[in-house]
Amino acid sequence: MEITIEMIKELRERTGAGVMEAKKALEEANGDMEKAVTILREKGVIKAAKKAGRVAKEGIIEAYIHTGDKLGVLVEVNCETDFVARTDEFRKLAKDIALQIAGMNPQYVSKEDVPPEVIEKEKEIYRTQLKNEGKPEHVIEKIIEGKLEKFYEEVCLLEQPFVRNPEIKVKDLITEAISKLGENIVVRRFARFVVGED
């Protein structure tokens, strides 16, 4: 399939990739736009991993108040430079993350933030459920691991499916932004407020 300038332009707009990167990805994907995006994301993950160790001390605090003024979110999203913090792309990312928190009510930023005692309690609940269902002992641990992943998707912001595109997780959204903006990006912390709740 012939790769057109329009296809390259569209892929660049969607991913922030360079001209040659976009062209190569489209060629590799035989012109399939979605496959090309996946190829670039896979390559972008490598770029993002290289940037992950860099210190992110700049950034913004995004505030979101839901219609009706009964629900509000504050989220701190950090990057490496104030230049990136002022970009529309970074501000949109912070806003999307605030909307995610408002809609999906995560309890923690990442898996690493979940206290060990909470994980142990969940494992015990699953273990008891599975024994009561008569599951064989040798498969229980594997099932528990799968259930824990589902638990993380519910309570950890970075593991949640992104509300605007459930095909990707919030961490993938951040990885894409790291690739586009060329800086490490970190969700530092958040708070979600609901009128009448403690």
UniProtKB/Swiss-Prot annotation:
GO CC annotations, alphabetized: cytoplasm
CDD domains: UBA_EF-Ts
InterPro entries linked: EF-Ts_dimer_sf, Transl_elong_EFTs/EF1B, Transl_elong_EFTs/EF1B_dimer, Transl_elong_Ts_CS, UBA-like_sf
Region (Involved in Mg(2+) ion dislocation from EF-Tu): 81-84
Presence of keyword Cytoplasm: yes
SUPFAM superfamilies: Elongation factor Ts (EF-Ts), dimerisation domain, UBA-like
Keyword Cytoplasm: yes
Gene Ontology molecular function terms on file: translation elongation factor activity
Record Pfam families: EF_TS
Main localization, broad class: cytoplasm
Compartment(s) where it occurs, according to its Swiss-Prot or TrEMBL record: Cytoplasm
Lineage: superkingdom: Bacteria
Keywords per UniProt: Cytoplasm, Elongation factor, Protein biosynthesis
HAMAP family: EF_Ts (MF_00050)
NCBIfam families: tsf (TIGR00116)
Role description: Associates with the EF-Tu.GDP complex and induces the exchange of GDP to GTP. It remains bound to the aminoacyl-tRNA.EF-Tu.GTP complex up to the GTP hydrolysis stage on the ribosome.
Family recorded in the similarity comment: Belongs to the EF-Ts family.
Protein name per UniProt: Elongation factor Ts
Organism: Dictyoglomus thermophilum (strain ATCC 35947 / DSM 3960 / H-6-12)
